Amino acid sequence: MIIDGKLISQSLKDAMKIEVEALEQQYGRRPCLMVIIVGNNPASRSYVRGKIKATEYCGFDGHLVELPEDCTEEALLAEIERLNNDPAVDGILVQLPLPKHISEDNVIAAISAEKDVDGFHPENVARLWLNQHCILPCTPKGIIELLDQAGVEIAGKKAVVIGRSNIVGKPVSKLLLDRNATVTIAHSRTKDLAAVCREADILVAAVGRAKMVTAEYVKPGAAVIDVGINRTEEGKLVGDVDYDAVLPVAGAITPVPGGVGPMTITMLMRNTIECFLNRMGSATEA
């Protein structure tokens, strides 16, 4: 089975569109997402366009703040502070990567935790690991949603996550653990990686190496989630999984493009609604 992330994300966005109309009726305004981009990185610009397009589709207020490549860290932090203090703003996202002279850690920590739609703020990360209510990072959240929508059972299953990044590998392993999977985190130093992966009922590839996961890594019938986005020399987008080789072996697989990518943006929209509702709730209680 091919898990069609494009189709699933579209149906979720359609549902959110209706939800946003109801929220506007109830609260007198729509969720508002501010996206900040620094410089002219073409890949970043493409991602940002996709995010703004999704806000428009779902009926949010989505605004782009464009800052020059030579923008100082202080100027960026001042802009974040302005948005933190703006009651009309529900979500703030700074598109990564940033120019070398700006500290990503400082920028992520500067965004108010309650407006952190990426789920990267240290407070949200801590709350995830402490099993407390938090904004979840978009890609891991999207992966769980894809598995659920495809009817893949998680509880009691063996899951292997290849990759230990703070953005995907570690948080998705925690979400799988929370759903009662038995989780192994594998990485570049794992001995006999293929044998470890062959144990998995659910295999998540998030290493950033084109077509690294071949058929010998996959247990017949396993669900394979490909998080990788790699560009070949010919300019073609491919994942971390050798899709054509693994497709006949896997029970379910996400393609690249059209798998995890669309879900990441859709979960960003979901997180913006959550930030809006959290803020409206605390405003009502106050």
Which positions does each model-derived feature cover?
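Positively charged, low-complexity intrinsically disordered leader regions
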Residues: 1-28
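Short beta-strand segments enriched in small/hydrophobic residues
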Residues: 31-39
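Glycine-rich phosphate/diphosphate-binding loop of Rossmann-like nucleotide-binding domains
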Residues: 38-52, 134-223, 232, 236-247
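Short beta-strand elements in bilobed, periplasmic/extracellular small-molecule ligand-binding domains
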Residues: 55-69, 183-185
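Short, well-structured alpha-helical segments in soluble
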Residues: 75-87
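Anion-binding alpha/beta catalytic cores of soluble intermediary-metabolism enzymes, centered on
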Residues: 94-154
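Glycine-rich, N-terminal phosphate-binding loop of Rossmann-like dinucleotide-binding domains
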Residues: 96, 207, 227-228
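Rossmann-fold NAD(P)-binding glycine/threonine-rich loop
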Residues: 104-125, 228-280
